[in-house]
């Protein structure tokens, strides 16, 4: 079996729960066809660089897949039929990266020190 990374962009007017349900449908489809999903990351509602089918935002998801090629082809066929999906891209990779993607790692910047609030206004008045 081969390793794939798959990104899906769903319409902005569906709820986050519906976007998660779409991910679960994809997981079930891959597992029915003899594959395995190693990681699912929901990136949330993000701005699109340009409008796609009159949408300015989309629900982004990343899936790390270990599956045979026919399973991936069937998943892509199902996504072409689904009206909630704006775009998707599947890339074959040498090995699966199970760590947080850079998109989510950038959000989790809890290691940054807290800035004092009194310094904020002092620079503007000077």
From Swiss-Prot:
One GO term describing the cellular component: cytosolic small ribosomal subunit
Region Disordered, residue ranges: 104-126
Annotated family: Belongs to the bacterial ribosomal protein bS6 family.
Organism, as annotated: Caulobacter vibrioides (strain NA1000 / CB15N)
Annotated protein name in UniProt: Small ribosomal subunit protein bS6
Function, as annotated: Binds together with bS18 to 16S ribosomal RNA.
Basic and acidic residues bias: start-end ranges: 105-120
Molecular function GO labels: small ribosomal subunit rRNA binding; structural constituent of ribosome
Entry keyword Transferase: no
Keywords attached to this entry: Ribonucleoprotein, Ribosomal protein, RNA-binding, rRNA-binding
Source organism superkingdom: Bacteria
NCBIfam families reported in the protein's UniProt record: S6
InterPro entries linked to this entry: Ribosomal_bS6 (IPR000529), Ribosomal_bS6_sf (IPR035980), Ribosomal_S6_plastid/chlpt (IPR020814), Transl_elong_EF1B/ribsomal_bS6 (IPR014717)
GO terms classed as biological process: translation
């Amino acid at each position: 079996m081969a390793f794939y990374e798959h990104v899906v962009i769903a319409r902005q007017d569906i709820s986050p729960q519906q976007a998660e349900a779409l991910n679960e449908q994809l997981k079930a489809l891959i597992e029915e066809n003899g594959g395995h999903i190693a990681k699912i990351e929901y990136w949330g509602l993000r701005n699109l660089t340009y409008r796609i089918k009159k949408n300015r935002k989309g629900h982004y998801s990343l899936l790390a897949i270990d599956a045979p090629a026919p399973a991936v082809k069937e998943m892509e066929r199902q996504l072409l039929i689904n009206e909630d999906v704006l775009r998707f891209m599947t890339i074959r990779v040498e090995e699966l990266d199970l760590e947080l993607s850079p998109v989510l790692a950038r959000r989790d910047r809890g290691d940054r020190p807290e800035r004092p609030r009194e310094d904020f206004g002092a620079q503007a008045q000077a």
